[in-house]
Regions:
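Short amphipathic alpha-helices in soluble, non-transmembrane regions
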Residues: 151-157, 184-193
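Active-site beta-strand/loop microenvironment that shapes enzyme catalytic pockets
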Residues: 79-127
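Short glycine-/aliphatic-rich beta-strand segments at the starts of folded cytosolic domains
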Residues: 129-145, 175
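Short amphipathic alpha-helix segments
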Residues: 142-160
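Conserved short beta-strand edge segments in small beta-sheet-based binding/regulatory domains
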Residues: 161-167, 192-199
């Protein structure tokens, strides 16, 4: 896959795995920040307050630069790690998977737990719509009305997303474009007289 592309999920999806009376309810979320992850996990712990464990793993960044696995009281590496393994083996980024366990009275053992958390995470992934996204960069441009036609010509050819525009005293636009296309867009815009770019 290209460096500025990654795979993620389009929306929340749910999975379920049952083993020896224990139920493992899994959720996969598209996420962008650790703050968002914290809020989701806290919300699920509140909603499923009577569950014994709320284990999770996440990967953030197009190249999975930031990741974490949490066993939430299960034996070390029996829950978070197999969940994380499913995220990585499915080549996903910017996702959180939470698996909630309701204990059924029969211990599963280390290998049983690893298998259960792996299967629960896999089921959530199987129910999710996987999409490809690009890593985009955002810039803010300012220019005068005099060069409006030149700016619009560049934008028509480069096709960035116009996130906002303001044409009052002077013209301002916030633009978003795929990371690999940004140097060319920036170069072409900076050739326009009186135009300035802010990151």
């Amino acid at each position: 896959m290209e460096e500025d592309k990654y795979r993620t999920v389009n929306a929340i999806a749910e999975g379920l795995y049952k083993e020896k009376g224990s139920r493992f309810i899994s959720f996969i979320y598209p996420v962008k920040s650790e703050e968002e992850i914290k809020d989701i996990v806290t919300g699920l712990k509140t909603k499923y307050y009577d569950a014994r464990h709320h284990c999770y793993a996440y990967c953030l960044g197009a190249n999975r630069e930031r990741f974490r696995a949490n066993d939430d009281g299960e034996p070390s590496s029996t829950a978070g790690k197999p969940i994380l393994g499913q995220i990585i083996s499915n080549d996903l980024s910017n996702v959180l998977i939470v698996v909630i366990r309701y204990f059924g009275g029969i211990k599963l053992g280390v290998s049983g737990l690893i298998q259960a958390y792996k299967e629960a995470a896999a089921d959530a992934i199987n129910h999710a719509e996987i999409v490809e996204r690009t890593v985009d960069e955002v810039i803010h441009v300012r220019f005068t009305y005099v060069v409006m036609n030149d700016v619009m010509k560049v934008l028509k050819e480069a096709e960035p997303d116009i996130l906002s525009r303001n044409f009052e005293m002077e013209c301002e636009m916030t633009l978003s474009i795929r990371q690999k296309d940004m140097p060319r867009l920036r170069e072409r815009l900076l050739k326009i007289e009186s135009l300035s770019i802010e990151e």
